Amino acid sequence: MRVLGIDTSLRSTGVGVVDSLAGKTVAVEYGRIHNTDRVCLSECLRRIDGGIREIILRTKPDLASIEDIFFAKNAHTSMVLGEARGVVIAACATSGIPVYQYEPRRVKQSITGSGAAEKAQVRKMIMVLLGLKEEPQEDAGDALAIALCHLNSRSPVPELNPKPI
């Protein structure tokens, strides 16, 4: 199974593609879709859409996983993140890729055993679990963690498996 993990952000959307075959899990590719603060909102969203579609075409994932919505203190920040998240979901849906979502605490717990783990702890565990030689950038590491969370959430009992959004 190939999973595309996406850590949605307007300025630095992390992406990570992970393969799980015959009990072995490997990182296929990871990185980020970067937008500087000089790029307007609509152009940022266009770049995120194009970047996600390009990764889907190149890596052919079976599905995508993203983090569930969290509440920011600033309403404007929440709205912008929601717009970026909508673009990501639409790009996946248009490409025929089902999308699954996980709460941030569940992602951390799935990787480290603790839902209160620090981001640095998550990235270190990602390195161990995927055999990476270098620590991925924060957004890319988060995306790999989100992909691994989906793989760790599968059950042999179909009724217990997560449902796409």
Identify the residue ranges that each predicted region occupies.
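Phosphate- and other anionic-substrate recognition elements at nucleic-acid/protein interfaces
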Residues: 1-165
